[in-house]
């Protein structure tokens, strides 16, 4: 007996399309992840599959393909640094994502500077980045095409040039970079502040 086709829930005449399952969660931060092995070989990997997973303790994740050069550095040491990127770093961000550290020295080619991490032993920070998030891996989830590194934040370094009087860090003045569906974008103008939708008008 022929199976009856399920009735579509989406009204195709309403101008909607249904695609096969895929990742369309955009925009995302395009970050440069720095890591090193125990022999001191350091590399940079561009990652968009990243985000916050917990506020307390502060935790984040990155998802990396096992064939990437940096992957085995992170597995060996359990360390990596998430370096936020800016519009000035857009070219280097893309380049470090399409070149392999097996073939080139990304630090040298992109004129990026290694800095010492505060709490990590092996992974360096990128000094040209306005924010360096030092991470220790707590768990690795082998999901499929990518393996997810869950990590606790060990320390955060910030560029003092963006510190204002009173100790406020002007993160949104750094020219942060975003990634959306194959394109790099600036963040644009501020549309509101957290909680503004329920704030009482004066």
Residue positions per predicted region:
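Basic, polyanion-binding surface patches
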Residues: 1-202
């Amino acid at each position: 007996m022929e199976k009856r086709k399920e009735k579509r829930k989406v009204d195709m005449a309403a101008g909607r399309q249904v695609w096969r399952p895929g990742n369309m969660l955009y925009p995302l931060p395009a970050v440069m992840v720095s890591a090193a092995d125990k022999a001191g070989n350091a590399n940079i990997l561009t990652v968009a599959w990243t985000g916050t997973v917990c506020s307390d303790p502060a935790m984040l994740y990155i998802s990396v393909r096992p064939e990437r050069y940096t992957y085995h550095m992170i597995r060996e040491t359990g360390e990596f640094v998430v370096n936020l990127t800016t519009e000035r770093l857009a070219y280097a961000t893309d380049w470090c994502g399409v070149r392999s550290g097996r073939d080139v020295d990304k630090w040298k080619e992109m004129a990026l500077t290694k800095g010492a991490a505060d709490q990590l032993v092996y992974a360096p920070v990128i000094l040209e980045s306005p924010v360096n998030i030092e991470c220790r891996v707590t768990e690795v989830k082998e999901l499929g095409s990518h393996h997810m590194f869950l990590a606790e934040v060990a320390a955060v370094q910030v560029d003092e040039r963006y510190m204002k009087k009173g100790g406020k860090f002007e993160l949104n003045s750094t020219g942060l970079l975003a990634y959306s569906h194959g394109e790099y974008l600036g963040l644009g103008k501020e549309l509101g502040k957290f909680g503004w939708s329920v704030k009482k008008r004066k």
